[in-house]
Design a protein with these regions (language model features):
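Cysteine protease catalytic domains with a Cys-His-Asp triad
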Residues: 1-70, 76-81
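Enzymes acting in ubiquitin/UBL processing and closely related pathways
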Residues: 74-170
Length: 170
């Protein structure tokens, strides 16, 4: 619901997810685990005026309980893709595969090359705020478009706990 509010406020924004890491695995009835990601089409997003895309992934597969949340943010106009893991870990193979899919689609449309930026700074030291870091990252990038905030200084767990109260004040 939090991300839907931002989609309504920012018409150029689309949120996808939260999706498990194995989004492109085909299930027994032929559909992908997460159809929006399997069928993601850069040209369609451009036509619809959706120039900013936020995606939250869980690093567990679809048949598991969920382990750790991470986020991807695509700025189509700037030709940039940003990845945030609050632990500062490298982008997983499956998410990098999606990033490469976006890059290939851009290339097919004769658009300038998209660049992937990864956060290598560890922000999270608690064991429960990864979802909040992912939400905050997408919202911050949507509003401020400044990845340096995540690469240059640590954002503390206590700040995420305050944001949780703000985003989910019920």
């Amino acid at each position: 619901n939090v991300m839907k509010q931002y989609e309504n406020t920012y018409r150029c924004f689309e949120f996808i997810g939260p999706s498990p890491i194995d989004y492109d695995e085909h299930l027994s009835y032929g559909e992908c685990v997460w159809e929006e990601l399997c069928k993601f089409n850069l040209q369609d997003n451009i036509k619809r005026g959706k120039f900013k895309v936020g995606i939250i992934f869980n690093l567990d597969k679809h048949n598991k309980d969920g382990s750790h949340w991470v986020a991807l943010f695509i700025n189509i106009k700037k030709r940039e893709i940003y990845y945030l893991d609050s632990y500062g870990e490298k982008i997983p193979k499956q998410i990098n595969k999606f990033s490469n899919k976006v890059k290939k689609q851009a290339n097919a449309l004769n658009l300038p090359k998209f660049i992937l930026h990864e956060n290598k700074r560890r922000h999270q030291f608690s064991d429960s705020e990864c979802g909040m870091y992912s939400l905050y990252f997408i919202i911050y990038m949507l509003k401020n478009d400044n990845f340096g905030k995540f690469t240059k200084q640590r954002i503390k767990d206590d700040y995420m706990k305050k944001l949780r109260k703000m985003y989910f004040n019920h």
